[in-house]
Structure formats: structure tokens, C-alpha cells
Amino acid sequence: MLQNAQHTDEQRIEHLILDYKHFRVGRSVILHADCFEWMGRIPENSVHAIVTDPPYGVKEYDFDQLEKRSNGNGGIWRIPPSFDGHERAPLPRFTALNPKERATLRRFFLEWGKVAFHALRPGGHVFLASNAFLSQLVFGVLIESGLEFRTQLVRIVRTLRGGDRPKNAEDEFPDCSSLPRGCYEPWGILRKPLLPGMRVSDCLREYQTGALRRKPDGGPFEDVIYSERTPRDERDMADHPSLKPQSLLRQIVHAALPLGLGIIMDPFSGSGSTVAAAEAIGVLSIGTERHVGYFEMSRRAVPKLAGLETAIERPGQLAFSMD
């Protein structure tokens, strides 16, 4: 039965390619496509889960802003000062969004939620990376789009976001910080509602969705993950500004398919790290990326990222367990 389901999923993923430029990595596929257009074109109830890290400034991944980032001119990207001889990576200025841009962000995620709702099977989960500044806005908008808010996954990680002294007045106010140093990353866990009268067990039988997969040791998936920052070797493989570590993504991708069957989708696949995580643990995935530079980067990066051994694969070294 499981082999038949896997074979059916592999056939289904072929039909999701449509007429888009694409490449394959193992059993997974990445398309050069705009996710709004693509998700609107594919049949309803096509994918089992979504794991993604979307562009929160909306405009920070516009082509002109990416060019400014590459040239070191900033734009929406804040180019932090170096310290201890180390250069800090550019970060998008979420606090730079004015009311009009926040309204644009709201429309963006409302429309995105609607096409995601269309693409997901009933009971399909969405794992969506966010940040403390905008998560309350984005999660609320996704609820308006029709998705259920289930809970929040908290990734404990020490970042370089926040904690800065007042800009251009660092010497005048040396004992002040504009914001707390960020030490966690919120991920929204949402779900497409089950059909009326359907129980979780019914949904699992009919759609292979509705629940979360337990950890390999049999324990339940937890809503806190102690994480590392993305290691240097992974960043060398995939120079993407919001690259998440494989040790984190593999845990999330594992949880997203309760029976270990189905198709994971990353609509903002960037360097392909979610697809790489899916390949590493042996599940099917499909990613879409509209920026040709990142699309081509993922062609090179995904096989390398998928082949990495992380702490979660080493016996006795599950470094990010709550136990």
C-alpha cells in the first residue's frame, strides 16, 4: 500500500511541473516559476504540506533591491558594520516598512494564503518562518485567507538581529539598544481545515494529512527546537541571505508528512534548502523560485546540502532535542 502511494505521488509530481523550466534532484523538482501563478494553475488539493521562509519585506527580494544588496549599497537591506574583523551579512530592515508597505505586505500574504489553500490537501500543514516584528500581522492575515492557526514553533537561536545601539549615535548612547537582541525565530504552524465531519484519523486515511509525524524516537514533535545558526559550510554551498540550517529543516520536513508520504512544497525555494532537506530524509518535494539567480544557485546547492551529515543524523548527538 505504501509503495503504491509513493508511486502515485511520483506520478503526481510529474503533472505539477506544467510548462515551467525546471530541474530534478533525486525524486524532487525545482521550477523557475512565480509561486502565485503556479499555485493558481495546479489542481486543487495537490500537495500535502508547505515548508517555507517567505520574503517578509516583500520588496527585499525585488530585483532592484537584490542588485543593491550585491553592490553593498543597502536599499531595504541594512549593511551592518564589521566587528572583530568579521563582516556581518546584510539583513532586511523589517522596521523600515511604512504603513503603505505594511498594507502591501498584508495583501501579499492574504493572496498567498488563498493560493496555498487551493494547493493544499485538506489537513495539510503549513510551516512558515517568520520574525518577532511581523509574525502577529502575517499569521492573522493567513487565518483570514482560510487557514487554521494551530500553534507556533519557536526556534531558539542567537542571531545578530537587534541589540544595536541607536544608529549614528552609538557613542552618545553607549548603554542603550534600539531593540532586544533576537534569540528566537517564530514559525507559524497552520493547517488547511479538515472537511466537515472529518476526524483526523479519517483525514490520514483519505489524504495522508491532518496530523504531524512523531520524532524517530517515538516522541511527539515539539514546539521548541534548540537550533544552531546556519553553519559556514552550508552558507558556502548556498549564498542565500535567509538560508536555514539543514539540522533544523530536516526536523520540520520530517514532521510535516505524518505518514512519511506525499509531497512537500516550498513556494519560495531560494537556494533549495527545503528541497535538500526533503531529499536527505527521503521524501518527495517540489520548489518554485522566480529569481533566476537563486534558481540556478539551487541547481548546484541542493545536491551538496542534501548530502551533508548533520547533528540529527549522528547517534547520540541530537543536539537540539528538549530531552
Predicted segments, located by residue:
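Core catalytic lobe of class I
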Residues: 1-308, 312, 320-323
